[in-house]
Amino acid sequence: RLGKVAGPAAQRDVQEVLSQLIEATSNFRLSEMRTRDLARFIEAWGLLRHTPKGRLMERMCNTLEQRLKFSRDASEASSNDLNSAGITGAILGMSLAGFKHEGLLSIMCETVPDRLFEFSSSEISKMLYSFARLEYRHRQYLLAMGDHVPHRLKEFTAQEISTSVYAMWLLKFRHRKFLTGVCDHLPERLPEFNVHSLCNTAYALGKLEFKHRKFTAALSTHVASRVKDLNKEKMVANMLRSLQTLQSL
């Protein structure tokens, strides 16, 4: 990112430093690394949009998978266990790097449901969207998320709600309790949404074919007051199509 901002010369310097760091990392003994550091490396590769050459990413994911299995089966918590930020970061990193490690994703989906209250609204929405990017659909995890999120919607920002709804559509997961909770909650918060979040939410609900008269009526009224903003972003037609879909359900 620094290289892109500073220009081609700086970008070459950044790439050179990155190459040296990657070479040094390849010599690490993964068994001696802390669990949180493994997760941080995976997140870092994703943020850099970089998948290391060879099998380094796979080896890190394999090691982290085994650590999580050990932690899950242990009778007591350990200081080496992965916290909510570490779990979210690793999932985000894999999604940004386009690296789909089935074993690690599976154990994370088995681990997270029992710990959802440890996760912030930001972490929950990031996880959902990361799974959507990876096209990874774990039914039990999504059922748990759908049951949990409606109870915490007041903690979510407008963007986090929009991201979560859009992720559920990308995953083609129509969870009635989740969708009902969102639509019950949204009318009073519509002014908080920017036009992109508003359009994405309406589009996703329409694609999921979820009928909720109160929300649709509130959205129709609200859109009339946001025509100028929608027109500025050239999104009037998109919103009207989504509204038409919701009204026809």
Please give the residue ranges for each predicted region.
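Eukaryotic RNA-binding helical-repeat scaffolds
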Residues: 1-249
